[in-house]
Structures are given as structure tokens and as C-alpha cells.
Design a protein with these regions (language model features):
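Active/ligand-binding-proximal structured segments within catalytic/core domains
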Residues: 141
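Short, intrinsically disordered, charge-balanced linker/junction segments flanking boundaries
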Residues: 160-164
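Short aromatic/hydrophobic contact patches that present stacked aromatics
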Residues: 126, 159
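Surface-exposed loop/turn segments and immediately adjacent short secondary-structure elements
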Residues: 1-122, 128, 132-136
């Protein structure tokens, strides 16, 4: 069963870049909007312990953990200690320009689609459970990008952007 499901999703998510030349031509002509110097510096400013602490306080509880087994409740209980540890980790990531291998790990589970026969592979969707430290870093970056998203994304394409 595991092989069948694995093969099914590998096929669905396979790299299907058949026409790279056409894509390159499009990208050469495309002139995306740019952020100004101040906006760029704001995105790239050092991560603060306050950003980390606020995110830990607001972590959802009663959610399944990633491969490391640490829950939102764990992060909240040890918030002060973990804020310092995460700040050092995130600083090291920026300094070395490299994510730890654990940031690429996820526990993948199948969630049956509602009112469908769960025994059929196409009626299940994969869900990746990531480690909380990776999710915290992702959320810090998402919060920063969100401040400038309306300038970067064309107004016709903002259907799933909050506040648009």
C-alpha cells in the first residue's frame, strides 16, 4: 500500500518542466515590481527575540507535532528558554545561508477527503507535519513579506491574500 501511494504522489508532483526555453523567454521579458531600498532592508533586518516570542505565544495548541515531536504546548511552556535558542539558530541560518536538515523533514500523513471512499488512493490528500522551529521561521518571513505583498503581486492575483 505504501509503495502504491508513494508512486501515485510522485507521479502527480513530478517535475513537469517540458518547455524550459519558453519559460526562459517569458522570464527574460517579464519585469517584476521591485521593492525600494528601505523595504528591502526591512525584509532583511535581523530577526528579533520579540518576533519569536510573539509567535510562540500564538502557536496553535492541540495540533500534531512534526518529526521532532515538539508541540505548540511545549514551545509555550518553555517559551523563554526556546526564544533564546531559536534566536541563535536563526542567526546562524542567516550567517551560514543554510537551513538545518531538520527544516526539510516532515511527517507525511494521508487525510481522507470528506464523503469519499478512503480506500482509493485518489481520495486521500497528503499532509506534511513540519517541526515547529521551521514553522516559526517561515511565519516570521511570511509576516514580513505580507507588509509588501500588495506592491509585489498584481492586483488581479490577490484572491488569497489576507486584507485584499
Amino acid at each position: 500500500m505504501q509503495t502504491i501511494i508513494s508512486d501515485y504522489y510522485q507521479h502527480i508532483y513530478a517535475n513537469k518542466m517540458d518547455n524550459l526555453e519558453e519559460m526562459d523567454q517569458f522570464l527574460e521579458k517579464y519585469n517584476p515590481p521591485n521593492l525600494n531600498q528601505e523595504e528591502t532592508e526591512n525584509l532583511n533586518r535581523p530577526i528579533t527575540s520579540m518576533e519569536i516570542e510573539i509567535l510562540i505565544k500564538n502557536l496553535p495548541t492541540n495540533k500534531s507535532p512534526g518529526p521532532d515531536g515538539f508541540t505548540g504546548e511545549f514551545y509555550q511552556k518553555f517559551r523563554e528558554e526556546l526564544t533564546c535558542i531559536l534566536l541563535k539558530l536563526f542567526q546562524k541560518i542567516v550567517e551560514e545561508d543554510k537551513l538545518p536538515n531538520t527544516f526539510y523533514e516532515a511527517t507525511i500523513t494521508l487525510i481522507p477527503k470528506p464523503n469519499k471512499d478512503a480506500t482509493k488512493k485518489e481520495n486521500n490528500r497528503p499532509m506534511s507535519l513540519m517541526n515547529r522551529d521551521a514553522k516559526i521561521l517561515n511565519k516570521i518571513q511570511a509576516n514580513r513579506i505580507e507588509q509588501h505583498i500588495k506592491k509585489i503581486i498584481h492586483h488581479d492575483k490577490v484572491g488569497f491574500i489576507p486584507g485584499t
